[in-house]
């Protein structure tokens, strides 16, 4: 189980595919998403990584959090989220996750806070059909009708669909396809709509109902201290120079 990422919802647009189709996508932007701390089995009883994103002013950060950011050698963050991971997918503290953490064609689950609609009636909130437009109905055309029972049980059950506050709740949309990523600009483009308003923080994770495709970087795609993405295998490490080899032979 890999770590997710914290992204900012930029808005919606469309992308044109090579076969001429245009696909509606939501643009999500990574804003300096770094690992702030780790949770391990030995110390905490479970494994997880805490990610931070955005750039907060130091004067607006509590002293305890300032110390946490200083120990991790990262700048103060606006948003902190913890992601459960498997022990072999723990990321080092301080690394920055890049957009190619996900690949095109992969499915992800996206969580965000839905846009608030205020107080809404049952026709808008629960898709009720309303009462009849004529024949004895007076000033109750959009009401929900009876809410209770008879003398037994003599109460309204909890969870009864009625008018009330709509939106501004935590929503997860599952199995959205990643259409394209741009590691240089930190953009992830997913097909379809994503819960939340523009400028809001959104969480993106690997889809729990779909297997990971081949080519997904494990434990993830990241860079250290501004370097290029460190997802390359160890076999691609540069060979030693002849001067270094000669120095080793003469030692």
From Swiss-Prot:
Residues 228-241 have a biased composition (Low complexity). The modification N5-methylglutamine is found at residue 151. Residues 242-251 have a biased composition (Acidic residues). GO terms for biological process: translation. GO terms for molecular function: rRNA binding; structural constituent of ribosome. Methylated by PrmB. Residues 219-251 are annotated as: Disordered. Keywords: Methylation, Ribonucleoprotein, Ribosomal protein, RNA-binding, rRNA-binding. SUPFAM superfamilies: Translation proteins. PROSITE patterns: RIBOSOMAL_L3 (PS00474). GO terms for cellular component: cytosolic large ribosomal subunit. Pfam families: Ribosomal_L3. InterPro entries: Ribosomal_uL3, Ribosomal_uL3_bac/org-type, Ribosomal_uL3_CS, Transl_B-barrel_sf. Part of the 50S ribosomal subunit. Forms a cluster with proteins L14 and L19. Belongs to the universal ribosomal protein uL3 family. One of the primary rRNA binding proteins, it binds directly near the 3'-end of the 23S rRNA, where it nucleates assembly of the 50S subunit. This is Large ribosomal subunit protein uL3. The lineage of its organism: Bacteria, Pseudomonadati, Pseudomonadota, Alphaproteobacteria, Hyphomicrobiales. The gene is rplC.
